[in-house]
Each structure stands twice: as C-alpha cells, then as structure tokens.
C-alpha cells in the first residue's frame, strides 16, 4: 500500500511542518490522519488531481495517539483537517466542540454529525498465509475463539486494542458473541498466542502474513481480499462471530477567524474524488 510521497510529508508522530497556522489561503493545509497508506494514497491522488498539489501536508499517527491529541488539544491542535475513526471524532466534538459544520452536502445511508463525512468503511477478518498454513500443518480457524488454540501459538499476529481501531473490530465481535467478561478472557489468550506480534498498526498483521513471518492474523478484510485477488498466498475467513465494521471520516478544525478556507474545499474534494 505504501507509495513514494513526492509532495507531502508523512511522519509517525510529532509536530507537522509547513502548517497553516493562520487564515491565509496560501498557507499549506495540515492534515492529521490515522489512515493506512492505501487510504492516504487515495486521498493524495484526489487532492493532487483536482488542483491541490503542493497545498497540503499529511501527518500520520496511530489511532490512539491521534485520538489523544484531539481530546487533549481540541481547537489548539496544529492540524487544519483530520481523517480519523468516526467514534473518536464524535467523542472529540462532544468534549471540545472543535469541528466546523461541513459546508458541502454529504449523502449517507446512516446518520452522521454535520461536522464529519465518512470516507471509508472497514471490516475485520481472520487472515492466513496459505503456504505457511500448509507448511506447519495448521488447521484453518473458523471463528475468533479458535485463535486461542495452542496450535497457533507463535504463528499469530494481532493488533493492540490500546492503539489500533482494527482491534476494536475484534473486541466488538467477541463482546457481541460471548459477553464482556468472556471476551476479555478470550482476548487475553489470543494475546498469549500472539506473543511478540501484538502490533500497533491495523495493517501490520496482514503485512506479517504477506511477508511469511506469521501464518495467521486479524486485520482488515478488504486488504486480504486484494492480496488474494493479486495472487499472493493470502486467504481470509469471515469469523462466525460476525464481521463488525467501523467508519473513518474527515472533519475540519474550527479555528474561528484563523480557519483556512481551503480546508473545507479539500475535505469536499476527498469526499467527492477520493
């Protein structure tokens, strides 16, 4: 999913460079995002192909890190615009009233706040490296609870519920199927089997499966579907507990008179062309 970034900067954390820090429309828009490389690439292409090349910078963060910044910094955050898990945006808006009402129409089946427009919907799935499954004579899991089996110990990668929204998909499915207490017990054993492969990034389990470092992971379904279609030794299982989904949305920071008007225009561009 990663591509060379010729005109934008993506950093793992820290402060953005080239921020707008003012209302002039000639200043670059600072975009904070928790999105994976593939989604960022789509947003970049939308902006670059519609007149906004060299007018923005992207700064990447883990979900929990960016969520913490939104809650702690509110309107004082350096970003002009964010793309983020919708439930985090809702929490930040409820606490800080920090987002502008979007000034363009947003057509959705579900109801969203007038400050956020969904850009992606993501589902979780069990991912497998079929070559490694055969090599180590591992049976294919059919449900999330199967990931607690001892045969998978050392062959499993998972995301950390403290840092990745992808782990939220796993946790919600477990709670729905087994209740909160049993879900915690199941998750604890899954983490034991994952060992050193409890990852911060939602795409990390797939990347590890793709690289042949682990045989099984829990990650984003659409990424596994794409890898399988491209002929990689990747397959996926929709767990019997169900596929939960979450949305990622775009929002514009309300900086009052210092709000850069390009932020709304770029948000609309991402929605219409991303």
Q: Where is each model-derived feature located?
A:
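Extracytoplasmic ligand-binding site segments that recognize negatively charged/polar headgroups
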Residues: 33-41, 61-64, 78-210
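A bilobed periplasmic-binding-protein/Venus flytrap-type ligand-binding module shared by bacterial periplasmic
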Residues: 127-132, 172, 247-259
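Short amphipathic alpha-helical coupling segments at ligand-binding clamshell hinges
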Residues: 42-43, 182, 186, 248, ...
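Short alpha-helix C-terminal cap/hinge motif
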Residues: 42-57
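Loop/turn elements at helix/coil->beta-strand transitions in domains of secreted/extracellular proteins
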Residues: 27-28, 52-54, 77-80, 152-156, ...
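A ligand-binding cleft/hinge motif common to bilobed small-molecule-binding domains
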Residues: 87-92, 210, 215-233
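Short, low-complexity disordered leader/linker segments with a strong preference
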Residues: 1-29
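Periplasmic-binding protein-like
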Residues: 109-110, 186-191, 198-199, 230-254
């Amino acid at each position: 999913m990663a591509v060379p970034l010729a005109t934008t900067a993506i950093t793992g954390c820290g402060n953005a460079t080239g921020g707008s820090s003012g209302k002039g429309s000639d200043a670059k828009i600072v975009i904070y995002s928790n999105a994976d490389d593939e989604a960022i690439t789509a947003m970049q292409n939308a902006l670059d192909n519609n007149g906004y090349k060299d007018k923005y910078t992207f700064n990447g963060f883990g979900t929990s890190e960016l969520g913490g910044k939104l809650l702690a910094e509110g309107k004082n955050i350096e970003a002009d615009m964010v793309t983020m898990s919708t439930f985090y945006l809702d929490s930040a808006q409820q606490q800080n009233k920090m987002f502008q009402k979007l000034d363009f129409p947003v057509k959705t089946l579900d109801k969203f706040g007038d400050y956020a427009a969904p850009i992606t919907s993501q589902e979780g799935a069990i991912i497998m490296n079929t070559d490694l499954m055969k090599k180590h004579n591992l049976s294919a899991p059919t449900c999330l609870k199967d990931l607690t089996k001892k045969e998978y110990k050392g062959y499993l990668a998972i995301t950390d519920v403290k840092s990745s929204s992808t782990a939220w998909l796993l946790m919600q499915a477990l709670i729905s199927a087994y209740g909160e207490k049993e879900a915690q017990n199941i998750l604890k054993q899954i983490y034991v089997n994952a060992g050193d492969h409890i990852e911060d990034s939602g795409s990390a389990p797939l990347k590890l499966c793709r690289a042949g470092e682990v045989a099984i992971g829990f990650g984003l379904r659409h990424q596994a579907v794409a890898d399988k279609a491209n002929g990689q030794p990747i397959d996926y299982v929709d767990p019997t507990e169900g596929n939960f989904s979450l949305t990622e949305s775009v929002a514009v920071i309300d900086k009052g008179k210092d709000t850069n008007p390009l932020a709304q225009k770029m948000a609309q561009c991402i929605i219409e062309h991303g």
